[in-house]
Amino acid sequence: FSQIRFPDNNQPWALNMARTIRRYREDYSWNPINVKYNDFSLQAGLLNGIKNVNPPIRLSFMPYASIYAESYDKQTTFPYNYGIDLKYGINESFTLDMTLIPDFGQVASDAMVLNLSPFEVKYEEKRQFFNEGTELFNKGRDMFYSRRLQDDLLNGSKITGRTKNGLGIAILNAITNETEENPLANYNIMILDQSLDNGSFISLMNTNKMQNGDSKNANVTGIFSRINNKENSHAYVAELKMSQEFDKDNYIKGYAGKLAVGKTSGNYQYDLYSIIEDDKYNSNDVGFLYSNNEITNGLVVRYQQFNENKRFINFSSSVAVVHQSLFTEQKFVDLEIEFENRATLKNYTTISLKADFNPYEKYDYYEAR
């Protein structure tokens, strides 16, 4: 209750609740959902009458101290840590979170992975500070990977919220201490996200890493938009990103972009998209990108039977065609055709069938040779 943002005046809240009965493959919701439309969040009900609520000041803090016993080469040391976490509700729209000299020693460790690929492993984020209130940053996809803020974190702070006019703002800043491998570094991530009618939005995001001394600095800027038509039957997506890497001797600039259009309602739906990354685009200083220098074009066509008929309770079928090539060299990489069918029978048994087909041999330019 003390952490919920209550406005001063009466404001309708969007709300929906759902229950899944697994044995019947059925979902029930408080507010009716038209399954012919993909965006369920736009079909929430309205909760009215929330007014005259006087919550306490949204302020909480948690100091902590920890000590460890470490034994190595017949020597035992007792390193210790201390710090504080703070959360403050600036107003009804925005919240400030801060952590000073955090200790993540109680966070579950990562599972061991035998990685034989040419790319690094992307691990799940388990630290609470980087999981709460960071949903807006996910719109940047490869631009932000919180596990980059890993080595000896000195402090972190973030401000998140959305104004009454639908402008979402999220700012995160963190400083990591100097280690034997890396210098002192400052990380900054910022996003502005304006909600539009019919679930549309336009966003501007920037990530920045500044390191002490002559080490490389990096900056990535991206603009993202999704426009839904009035009937929410079609969606149009556009993205443009620019990366910059610079030190005292070099300056590298790269670009990436995406265009997509899709039919998002009805029995027949489709997605048509094109993704381009040049050979100099690199978001890995703050984000996570497996590889650049790629062109990916794809088409997905789906048929979905929503109403029960004589044979099936529901049925879906899709075919996807994806073509990949290198951007700079204009060389073929792969052509994949994927078929997928899924049906729920009258006895509630669900059957699925999936098949992949590559008419040409795939050429992996990253494999060890």
Question: At which residue positions do the language-model features occur?
Answer:
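Polar/charged side chains located within well-ordered beta-strands of beta-rich proteins
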Residues: 155, 171-173, 186-188, 194, ...
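Flexible loop/turn segments at secondary-structure boundaries
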Residues: 22-24, 70-72, 94-97, 103-108, ...
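Transmembrane beta-barrel strands of outer-membrane/channel proteins
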Residues: 17-19, 63-67, 100-102, 171-173, ...
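Residues that define the transmembrane beta-barrel architecture of outer-membrane proteins
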Residues: 57, 76-82, 151-155, 183-188, ...
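Structural preference for beta-rich elements and adjacent junctions enriched in aromatics
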Residues: 1-194, 200-204
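Membrane-embedded beta-strand positions in outer-membrane beta-barrel channels/transporters
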Residues: 60, 64, 83-84, 156-158, ...
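Beta-propeller domains
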Residues: 178-181, 185-187, 197-259, 278
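Exposed, low-structure sequence patches enriched in small/polar residues
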Residues: 152, 160, 231, 235-369
